Amino acid sequence: MYKYETHLHTSEGSTCASSSGAEMARAHKAAGYDGIFVTDHFFNSSTTVPKDLPWEKRIDLYCKGYENALEEGRKIGLDVFFGVEWTINGADFLIYNKDKAWLKDNEHLLMEADERELFNEVRKTGGFIVHAHPFREASYIPHISLYPHDVDAVEVINTRNSDPLFGGNDCYNDRAKAYAAMYGLPETGGSDTHNTEQIVNGGILVPERINEPADYLRQIKTGSVIPLEGSFKK
């Protein structure tokens, strides 16, 4: 089996993260991971990227954490993939199989369009979407928002749901599992890691190596993904 982290943040792109992309790559390699997906918060959430720059420059800065992790990963033998954590009304969605060029070409879609228009376009053009921690409760989340017909999978285990910041309540994961089962949505998992101290054996196991994000989607669709419980470090 192969182990991957599907949900992590870097200090280059997310204000809530405190470890760089390169540091994250080294730490995950040391922890026995075969690869990671860098999913920094986009501009509608906790981004480090200034608002007053040209769009293309903003995207360049946004991708720095991933690019630094990728460079380090190539040196140490860790596969590194790109993702985006996109937010609407406090609900977070992990977008995969899109790249920097696509982000640069879709400012309107990412910043102004209705969320279902974005989701539809992402999926229609080869990307896929995982609803991250759908039942998390926090001060910045005004209400629970579910999109069962617009996503490809549900993050049924988010290791960081055990963080006291969110009430330290594992029931959020239990509710996510029930939701996925109710709608017949595939399950996946992620640690939602923000620094190297939070690498807690979360993420996923899959039977086949992921060489590109499409390999992850294929294994999601076949039900081959095993979400890992992990254990949040307080």
Predicted features by range, described:
Residues I36-V38, V130-H131, E155:
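Conserved beta-strand positions in the central sheet of alpha/beta enzyme cores
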Residues M1-T6, T10, S20-R26, N89-L103, ...:
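Charged catalytic cores and adjacent phosphate/nucleic-acid-binding surfaces used
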